């Protein structure tokens, strides 16, 4: 099955995006596989309440959603994988380090990469969510291999538009979509991009 990996720093909105995008694609219930077990929530809101947090490193295991995306050639099934946040430094926690190892291990095994930034933090150097060296490395990796889309998330927050412009300047030559995991902004563009490349 084709795999699409959602990567980025902690607290940029990867889990919320993954859950809401699954709903946008027509998933009525959220069925998620993680740590070798499958779990189901009756609604995306239930899953969001349990899985999304303002705390960094809430996602410590790869979370796999099997979804269908409709295109001109019919419907295609793919796996959307929500990952633990990657950091510029080595985390003290062994659980967080393992989550990062798991994420990096899937980079080369995934057909498509969705790299998420917090657009509202782009212009705030020193903010934990601000783009850092790990984002630069993901950008270069994605640009070199193709099948890569940069997502500037949190466009519903103050400062995000300026952050979007700055991200376009810092990360040139790759497709970028302004999204909001909260409002659904940009989901149609992401879907179109995936339809073309999956």
Tell where the protein language model's regions lie, with residue ranges.
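A conditional alpha-helix N-cap/helix-loop micro-motif detector
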Residues: 58, 93-96, 130-131
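Conserved G1/Walker A P-loop phosphate-binding module
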Residues: 1-88
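Helical mechanochemical/support elements of P-loop NTPase systems and associated helical scaffolds
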Residues: 58-61, 76-79, 99, 160-163, ...
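Short, conserved catalytic or interaction motifs in soluble domains
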Residues: 30, 92, 119
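Canonical P-loop GTPase G-domain recognition
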Residues: 156-198
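Conserved C-terminal guanine-recognition region of P-loop GTPase G domains, centered on the G4
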Residues: 99-174
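Charged, alpha-helix-enriched surfaces in structured cytosolic catalytic cores
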Residues: 12, 16, 95-98, 184-185, ...
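Catalytic P-loop NTPase motifs of RecA-like helicase/translocase cores
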Residues: 13, 87-88, 123, 158-159, ...
């Amino acid at each position: 099955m084709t795999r699409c990996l959602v990567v980025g720093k902690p607290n940029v909105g990867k889990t919320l995006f993954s859950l809401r995008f699954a709903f946008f694609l027509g998933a009525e219930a959220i069925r998620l596989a993680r740590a070798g077990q499958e779990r189901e929530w009756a609604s995306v809101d239930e899953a969001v309440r349990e899985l999304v947090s303002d705390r960094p490193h809430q996602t410590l295991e790869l979370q796999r959603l099997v979804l269908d995306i409709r295109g001109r050639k019919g419907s295609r099934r793919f796996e959307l994988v929500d990952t633990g946040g990657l950091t510029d430094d080595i985390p003290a926690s062994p659980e967080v380090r393992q989550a990062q190892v798991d994420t990096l291990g899937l980079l080369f095994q995934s057909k498509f990469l969705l790299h998420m930034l917090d657009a509202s933090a782009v212009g705030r150097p020193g903010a934990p969510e601000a783009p850092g060296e790990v984002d630069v490395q993901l950008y270069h990796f994605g640009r070199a291999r193709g099948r890569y889309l940069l997502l500037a998330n949190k466009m519903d927050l103050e400062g995000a538009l300026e952050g979007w412009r700055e991200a376009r300047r810092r990360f040139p030559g790759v497709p970028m979509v302004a999204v909001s995991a909260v409002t659904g902004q940009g989901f149609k563009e992401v879907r179109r991009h995936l339809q073309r490349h999956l």
